[in-house]
Amino acid sequence: MSDRIEPKRYDETSPRYAGWRVVLACFLVALFLFGFGLYGHGVYVAELQRLRGWPAALISGASTLTFLLSNVFATFTSELIARFGPRRLILLGIAALAASTTLLAFAREPWQLYAAFILMSFGWIGMGTVVIATIVSFWFERRRGLAISLAFNGASLGGVVVAPILVLLVEEVGFSAAMLTATAIMVVILVPVVVAWIGPRPPSADPAERETQYSSSSQMPAAATDISRAIIVRQLAFWTISVPFALALVAQIGFIVHQIALLEPKIGRPGAGFAVALTTAMAVIGRLCLGMVVDRLNPRLVTAASLASQAAALLTITQTDNPTVLLAAGAVFGFSIGNLITLPPLIIHREFDAAAFAVVMGLSSAISGTVGALGPGLVGLVRSWSGGYAVPLAICITLELVAAVIVLCGGQKQHTIATV
């Protein structure tokens, strides 16, 4: 008798479907990764400056190095998933992130600081958006958009949950003890969840796809590591995904980083702080709302609409000092923030072979993430040159609109990528 499991259709709408436990696991992975690996950086800069007397430029340089390395390494995520399997790769990412935050707690020399942030970049590789999107996509077809949206909501909540808890712990027990305590909490929660819930996907009802599932113990298609990146970058569809999201991230990250400095003269520091909280909250709501309907929509059209709404919100901010209108504009901007993470994998799934997903996603994320990291610096430089935020915001609006036009230039044709 054959040991091969016969395929059947799984009800992705059922709460008992195992894929939803995978989504919850990925949600928690994103929460801790973005909490420690992104939103926690503000805590590290402030505390290490105070405790060690290091200049902000030194610490910020280490922080920037993390994002640059993680974006470069994201290109090779498909090979790592194929080599280690999703579960082991995430566990390695957790180990790297935990080692990073532990080293930060004991860092006394600049080289230790940089070693910690380099380790953090490996945490991003093992736990990042490409890995999460790939794992969730294993388990969902008809409800893929909702599943990815829910998983990525952990990224937004990382700023709402992890960063404030870090601040409170630092005030109570000091920076070193706070980092060790928070790291222990992360490991105790994530390791059992990942071990228990992230495993092989269920067998597909598609016979052709079923063959690829049994070709690798890591559950990656056998040809995933043979996909030609040279062929991918010659596809127009690839660039109509990567370029618009890169331009949009420049504008989005630039605005987010400078939001308090921009709004404080208009509505005061408490008002600016509330605006940031409102923007973050709307990012969570927006991703949830999108997830409910995106599986029935064209993700390119949704992307263009999201970018146009952000451009309109920024234009409104440049034209008024009214606190209510400014808060409303910030809410509109925030509503689509999270969607710029959710939408790329949905477009890629529609337009590229399933076997090429991790490769295309890794390449696209590397490009958009690296370019997007320039946003805060660009906005800051133009502000210093122009003496205000009117010109930087005009540039951001232009980038958003150009991105909206480019993303509409792509189509829904399925692109077959040759192997090497």
For the regions a protein language model found, what residue spans apply to each?
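Interfacial helix-cap and linker-helix signal at transmembrane-aqueous boundaries
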Residues: 48-49, 80-81, 161, 165-173, ...
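Intracellular juxtamembrane helix-capping segments at the cytosolic ends
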Residues: 126-140, 339-352
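Helix-loop-helix hairpin linking two adjacent transmembrane segments in secondary transporters
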Residues: 155-202
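C-terminal ends and interior cores of transmembrane alpha-helices
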Residues: 95-108, 309-321
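Extracytoplasmic gate region of multi-pass secondary transporters
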Residues: 41-45, 234-288
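C-terminal transmembrane helical hairpin of 12-TM major facilitator-type secondary transporters
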Residues: 279-283, 289, 294-347
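Extracytoplasmic
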Residues: 21-56, 73-77, 163, 254-260, ...
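A late C-terminal transmembrane helix in Major Facilitator Superfamily
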Residues: 351-386
